[in-house]
Structures are given as structure tokens and as C-alpha cells.
Amino acid sequence: MSWARSRLCSTLSLAAVSARGATTEGAARRGMSAWPAPQEPGMEYQDAVRTLNTLQTNASYLEQVKRQRSDPQAQLEAMEMYLARSGLQVEDLNRLNIIHVTGTKGKGSTCAFTERILRNYGLKTGFFSSPHMVQVRERIRINGKPISPELFTKHFWCLYNQLEEFKDDSHVSMPSYFRFLTLMAFHVFLQEKVDLAVVEVGIGGAFDCTNIIRKPVVCGVSSLGIDHTSLLGDTVEKIAWQKGGIFKPGVPAFTVVQPEGPLAVLRDRAQQIGCPLYLCPPLEALEEVGLPLSLGLEGAHQRSNAALALQLAHCWLERQDHQDIQELKVSRPSIRWQLPLAPVFRPTPHMRRGLRDTVWPGRTQILQRGPLTWYLDGAHTTSSVQACVHWYRQSLERSKRTDGGSEVHILLFNSTGDRDSAALLKLLQPCQFDYAVFCPNVTEVSSIGNADQQNFTVTLDQVLLRCLQHQQHWNGLAEKQASSNLWSSCGPDPAGPGSLLLAPHPPQPTRTSSLVFSCISHALLWISQGRDPIFQPQSLPRNLLNHPTANSGASILREAAAIHVLVTGSLHLVGGVLKLLDPSMSQ
């Protein structure tokens, strides 16, 4: 038994852990094993996804990554090779009239706004994004909807078998998971004859596999920050260099206001490449020439994403000679940023409706269910968590109760990869949660039946250990805060007025209790206490309330007039929660 499992069993005694029993190691082993690849088209959707999942740990790919790490350009060359093996050439992608978008935070929301705007013009849209919330087919959308299981299965096996057929002595490997899905998206969009494709970069830009695109119609860079440091660099300037790698000669690009250093890097990259780069004016500037704009996505930070989306959509329409766009005001240079400002124009009715009707699950999303309110945001960088906290606190302010009923505030958190979870948790601490709950991005620990939610790159032990580390960080922050409060208002020493010493007040218990569960389902069972009208499991795991904090908290949760739950730190965590709270997303 590993240290992580032993620690969980001995200190928490949660049913989520004890019910795991012997299945944990078996599940972990099964997770690391390869599924046999079916050879016949027409297989079921789950079979296709299971085969796709084997590419997460493809041994030859991992070896290839090691060889290519010192030569990132080789990654793009490999992607072009896979594209050729699949029956396409790079030039074929030009027919997709692509909008290529990168950034650290907000790139997915920007893409969603952009796609929705252009769909309002009667255009047939393709949209490639990552990661998925519940089902992998969400990554490839036609007219805003994930492709059907049948279409996914059809295209998956056609591509898989094509790549298998054209293996040779020098090209024996299959593409990795994300490369495969990128290739598949291109094939789907071409065969479905979309008018345009909105393509979100996976990681970075310069050496991302989507960057085999040679002639996009327009490019965009959303807000920059620190993320994926092991791949992109440990400063925002280094990351900006990677993001600017999607710029193409003569292709317009737009970005939002950035810190001076990374913006200068983007400007220099654009000049070197020969790309005209524009700075988006704030949304307020476009509202000055029209009515206020309503956004379908909540949060003040979405205004920056919407401003970028409007410029991308407007530029695409202009370059495609679309008639239904307003006359532009003359663009003027920005002296402060040393970049030309993008045009200010009057948003058309199609644009206005597009912004208003945009839906993007798991980003500043609120689900109101009986006494429970779920606040879902996949923020996973310091800047995006800051924005998440601002949105969450504003949302709480709007929903303040007037009847004086008791309220409970809960944080459900996980963070993966090389992200600094201690820094993220520190940003969340001021929200004054009553309980902090941690769990891995595993929907059901005892089941591996749903291939969409599987991650073969880590074991259950590893992710449980990570959750324990999150809990330790959180408890450390709480203790530090308690210590700070202890001395913040010191009283005279009891020895008498002549003493020069100050005595702290008696220690107070820390406000937040913390718990670790071994899967999302068990965490939601404890949080909801059967009070969510949709999330109603047939039976509770044994010993779910064995831990004193879980037991005492359960009675508080059952009696609370309102329960507010912020789910954040990982898009995969949010996706797992949505899978359980919104069964329609699995259909």
C-alpha cells in the first residue's frame, strides 16, 4: 500500500478511500495498459475513445518527445509527416479559412465568442478546442455542437486505419493523443465543408501541433500569464515569444492589453515575421458608438475576451469580403504601447447577439439547484484564479440572502501538472470558505467504464498524493492566517501594566476545515447531502462520515439554508463535476 493511500486511510478514513479497496491498484494498472486497437470501422464510440486513450502513453511517442525536446522544430515536422500519412497536405488546410487563437487565459472563451458571432451570419463553423469537459467529441464542433458519437466514431477509425496502413520503417509510430485529435479535426472540417474553422492552440504556439497552419485568415492572442513553465519558459516574456509563434507573414493579428514586457516581445515577433499586429481597444470604446453589449459569459475578465473576439470576427468578415459590416473609424497608433490600435466599429446585430448567446461550459458558469449553488470555473493560473475570485465574490454579493438563513461556503479544488497550487490556494483563501474539499480529477474511483474521463498518464496514487499536498498547503495557509490574527490585536500582558510585553489573545480555531476524497462523486455526495435535486445517487458509500469533520459537517450541510460551492483549479475537475451534475452533457 502506497504512502498516499495509507495516509488517506489512517487520517481521513473516508469511505471514498476505504471503498476503493483492492480496486485502486487494479484500476491504476488497467489505466496504464494498452487497449487492443480494433481494426474494423463501425466500432462503438467508447471503443474508439479507448483506442484513442492508448495514445496518451504511446511508448514510441514518449521516446520521440525525448529526442525532439532539444529540437522543437522537429515536432512541427513530425506533425506535417502525420498529416501527409493521413492523406492531407499543409496547403489543404488553407481551405478552412482558419482563425488561430492562442493565449494563457481566455483563449477558449475568445474562440467561443468568435465562433458564435460568425455562426450568426449563417456561416457553417468548425471549432477545435481543448480540453473537453465530459466527452472528447466536444473538442470538435460543427455549428457550435459537438460532433455526434457516430460521426466521431466514423472519422476516428478512418483516420486511425489510414495512419496504420501507411506506416513504414521510418514512420512506425502513431501520433500522440492531442496530435491525433488535431489531425482528426482538420479531416472533419474539410469533409463537412465548413466555411471557417476556429482553432484554439493546445500549448504555447510556436511549436504547438496546430501551428502547421500556414495561411490563417487572422490570428489572436488573449491575455498572457505563467503556465506550462516546463515547456514554455518561466517568465511571461519567454511565454510571449512562444505565443507569438503563430503569427504569419501578412496575416493580421490582434491582442489585448498585456504587461509591457510580454507586449514588447509580441511586437518584436510580429515585426520579425512580417505580421501586422493590432492592439484591441477596450469593449467600452465599441459601446461608445452603439448600445451597451451584453455577454453570455459572466465575469469582468470576459470583456477583454469579447473585445478580441469582435476584432477577430470583424477582420475575418472583412478579409472574406462580407458585406454586412459597419464602416470603420480610422485606426490610430497607441503611443503608450507602440502598436496601432485596432479599428473602432459599430458592432452589428449579428455580433451583439453572438456575444449575448455565447455558452461555454465550465467557465464562470453557475448552476442553481435547490439550496445548492455551484460556481464552476476552470481557472488554473494565478491570473485566471484572481479573475475567478473576483467573479465569485461579485456573484455572492448579488445573491445575498435577506431572510437571515444560514449559509455554508465550500471550495472544491484540484490542480495538476507543474502548476503552483500553493500560490493558487493563497489567492482563494480570502473567500473565507467554511470547508475546503480536495479530490483528483476522477469521476468514479471504482469504475473505468467511461473512456472519455480516463487519463492514462498518471496513477491514482500520484493524484491522491497531490491532493494531500493541496490540503497541506491549505492548512498551512489557515494556520499562518490564524497566527497573524493572534498578534494583530494584542492586549496588555496579564503580569500588569508595568510589563513591556504584549500578550496575544487566546488562540481561535481556524475557520476552514479541510477534507480529501478519492473521487469527485464522493466529494459531491458529501457536499450535497442528497439535497441536489438532480445529483441523487441510489446509495451512499459506507463510512462516508467516519471522519469527525465529515460527520459534523454533514449535519451543518443538511440544515443550511444555502450552500455555495466554488469548483476551480482545473478544467478537468470542472468537467467531472459537470458530468455528474448535468447528465445531458453525457448524451
Swiss-Prot record:
GO MF terms, alphabetically ordered: ATP binding; metal ion binding; tetrahydrofolylpolyglutamate synthase activity
Residues holding Mg(2+) 1: S130, E200
SUPFAM superfamilies referenced in this protein's UniProt entry, alphabetically: MurD-like peptide ligases, catalytic domain, MurD-like peptide ligases, peptide-binding domain
Gene3D superfamilies: Mur ligase, C-terminal domain (3.90.190.20), Mur-like, catalytic domain (3.40.1190.10)
Binding sites annotated in the UniProt record for Mg(2+) 2: H228
EC number(s) on file: 6.3.2.17
Disulfide bond entries: none
Reactions performed catalytically: (6S)-5,6,7,8-tetrahydrofolyl-(gamma-L-Glu)(n) + L-glutamate + ATP = (6S)-5,6,7,8-tetrahydrofolyl-(gamma-L-Glu)(n+1) + ADP + phosphate + H(+)
Name of the protein in question: Folylpolyglutamate synthase, mitochondrial
Transit peptide: 1-42
Cofactor, free-text remark: A monovalent cation.
Keywords on record: ATP-binding, Cytoplasm, Ligase, Magnesium, Membrane, Metal-binding, Mitochondrion, Mitochondrion inner membrane, Nucleotide-binding, One-carbon metabolism, Phosphoprotein, Transit peptide
Tissue: With non-specific probe, highest content in kidney and liver and lowest in spleen, lung and small intestine, and readily detectable in all of the tumors except hepatoma. Isoform 1 and isoform 2 expressed in leukemic cells and isoform 4 and isoform 5 in liver cells. Isoform 1 and isoform 2 exclusively expressed in hepatoma and Lewis lung carcinoma. Isoform 1 and isoform 2 also expressed in bone marrow, small intestine and spleen. Kidney expresses isoform 1, isoform 2, isoform 4 and isoform 5.
Cofactor: a monovalent cation
Record note on quaternary structure: Monomer.
Protein family per UniProt: Belongs to the folylpolyglutamate synthase family.
Sites of Phosphoserine modification: S539
GO biological process: glutamate metabolic process; one-carbon metabolic process; tetrahydrofolylpolyglutamate biosynthetic process
NCBIfam families: folC
Activity over temperature: Optimum temperature is 37 degrees Celsius. Activity completely lost within a few hours at 4 degrees Celsius in the absence of ATP and glycerol.
InterPro entries: Folylpolyglutamate_synth, Folylpolyglutamate_synth_CS, Folylpolyglutamate_synth_euk, Mur-like_cat_sf, Mur_ligase_C_dom_sf
Biophysicochemical property: pH dependence: Optimum pH is 8.2-9.5 using 500 uM folic acid (PteGlu) and 25 uM dl-5-formyltetrahydrofolate (dl-5-CHO-H(4)PteGlu) as substrates.
Enzyme class: ligase
Any one of the GO CC terms: mitochondrial inner membrane
Gene this chain is encoded by: Fpgs
Pathway: Cofactor biosynthesis; tetrahydrofolylpolyglutamate biosynthesis
